[in-house]
Each structure stands twice: as C-alpha cells, then as structure tokens.
Amino acid sequence: MKRFYKTAFFSEIGSEEVSHFWADTMSSHSPLEQFSILPLIPMNIGNLYFSFTNSSLFMLLTLSLVLLLVNFVTKKGGGNLVPNAWQSLVELIYDFVLNLVNEQIGGLSGNVKQKFFPCILVTFTFLLFCNLQGMIPYSFTVTSHFLITLGLSFSIFIGITIVGFQRNGLHFLSFLLPAGVPLPLAPFLVLLELISYCFRALSLGIRLFANMMAGHSLVKILSGFAWTMLCMNDLFYFIGDLGPLFIVLALTGLELGVAILQAYVFTILICIYLNDAINLH
C-alpha cells in the first residue's frame, strides 16, 4: 500500500519534480559533507580572513591527547616501574619508530640518528592519532584535507633537503645525475630527476589525503544506504539491509587498519627520503 501511494505521488508531480526531489535529498546527505571545514571563531585582520575552524579544533585536541598520554605514562607524570596498558602502548610506539629509524637510515652513528628521531616520532604519533580520531562518529578527519597533508609533507621535505645540503654540501646535487650517464643525456636526466624529486613531497601528501578521504566516503555511502533500507519498514528491505550492514562493519575494521597503515607508510617514506638525502642513494 505504501508503495502504491509513493508511485501515485511521483506520477502526479512529474519526472522533473522527482529528479529535483532526489537531488535535494542526496545533496543534503552528501558523503563529502563530513569533510566540510566550518568556522567556529571568525577573525578578520584587515582584508585577511582568519578563523578557528573545526579542523583546528581537532588538531589541537589530537596534540593535547598525545601530550597528556605521554605525560601520564612518564615517571614524572605518574608512570609506574611495572608498565600499565597505556604505558605499554607508548613504549610500543616508541620502540617501533626507533627500530624504523635504525633500520631505514644508514651511514650515521646512533647519536646522530637520535637527532632525527624526535621529529619522526612526533610525526608518526600525530598522524596515527589524527587518523584514529577521525573514526570516531561526529568527529573530523584532519588528514582528509589536501592542504593539511600537503603542508605537512612539503615542510618535512624542505627539512630533508636542508639536511642533505648540510651533510653533503653542493655534492648533494649529484643526487640528480646518476653516474655513467652520457653527457648529451645529462640535461634531460637532471630535469627528470629534479621533477621526480619534487614530486616526492606531492605524492607523500596526496597518498595520505586520498586514502583517508576515499575510505571515509565509502563508509558514509554504505552506511546511508544501510540506514535507508532499515527505515523502509519492510521485511524484504530489512533482510536486504543485513548485507550492507556487514559490509559497513567490515569496511570500518578495514579503515582502522588503513588509519594505522597510512601513518606507517608516511613515516617510513620520510625515513627513506632522509636516507637518500644523507647517503645520496
């Protein structure tokens, strides 16, 4: 009976009105709506517009959470000689990143590697917690925005380039010209290597942004589809809803893995690029 009234209603208003109806319905529940940056505290300085947004809020919350967690598990902040669960988690992250730095960066003594370790540890921890808090309902995924990931990747990439010049001087430019290249091909290879080197920073930011945005969008689409079928008040639709519901649960678990994996991939690529800049590989 409900389907009959729906069919009669749509036949009376016409196909054009139906298309507008569904367009308005879908636009109000767009899967990209979760990535909207909303100003919380608007600020104007002359012709420049600044504002404290939801993205800024969740970045501050992530940093605060990391600082509180580290302070809590240290001895000064109340850590125990016998580690509890939180202390074990921080030690696990610390040892994981330390082993990553020791394995991927060669040609340096342990003391010199320790100079790079804090930056790499903070980067991994920040990205890990940003990705994980984006899985919480009604939160905001900071790493799903291209400008944020691109700003992070370019700032780290500039720092790696500076380290390369500090360690090797102008000999660092030999990284752009492989040994044994014929002289006529040298200008073309230098240009190609320079473009490839600069695109490292771009690909580093795009990879993180694209994976986080695509995964969250897919979960949102399937969640909306499952919820729509669940609200149909029909046994057929309810049974058909179980399939999308299980897929949503599986994708949520997959997204948790992707959140951890992307923080790892971002960090290991930083170590590889830093090793290339130091050892000119």
Swiss-Prot record:
It holds the Pfam family ATP-synt_A. The keyword Transport applies. GO terms for molecular function: proton-transporting ATP synthase activity, rotational mechanism. The keyword Transmembrane helix applies. InterPro entries: ATP_synth_F0_asu (IPR000568), ATP_synth_F0_asu_AS (IPR023011), ATP_synth_F0_asu_bact/mt (IPR045083), F0_ATP_A_sf (IPR035908). SUPFAM superfamilies: F1F0 ATP synthase subunit A. The chain crosses the membrane at residues 50-70, 116-136, 145-165, 172-192, 219-239, 246-266. Its main location: mitochondrion. It is a multi-pass membrane protein. One of its GO terms (cellular component) is proton-transporting ATP synthase complex. Keywords: ATP synthesis, CF(0), Hydrogen ion transport, Ion transport, Membrane, Mitochondrion, Mitochondrion inner membrane, Transmembrane, Transmembrane helix, Transport. PROSITE patterns: ATPASE_A. It is found in: Mitochondrion inner membrane. Mitochondrial membrane ATP synthase (F(1)F(0) ATP synthase or Complex V) produces ATP from ADP in the presence of a proton gradient across the membrane which is generated by electron transport complexes of the respiratory chain. F-type ATPases consist of two structural domains, F(1) - containing the extramembraneous catalytic core and F(0) - containing the membrane proton channel, linked together by a central stalk and a peripheral stalk. During catalysis, ATP synthesis in the catalytic domain of F(1) is coupled via a rotary mechanism of the central stalk subunits to proton translocation. Belongs to the ATPase A chain family. HAMAP family: ATP_synth_a_bact (MF_01393). PANTHER family: ATP SYNTHASE SUBUNIT A. F-type ATPases have 2 components, CF(1) - the catalytic core - and CF(0) - the membrane proton channel. CF(1) has five subunits: alpha(3), beta(3), gamma(1), delta(1), epsilon(1). CF(0) has three main subunits: a, b and c. This is ATP synthase subunit a. The lineage of its organism: Eukaryota, Viridiplantae, Streptophyta, Embryophyta, Tracheophyta. The gene is ATP6.
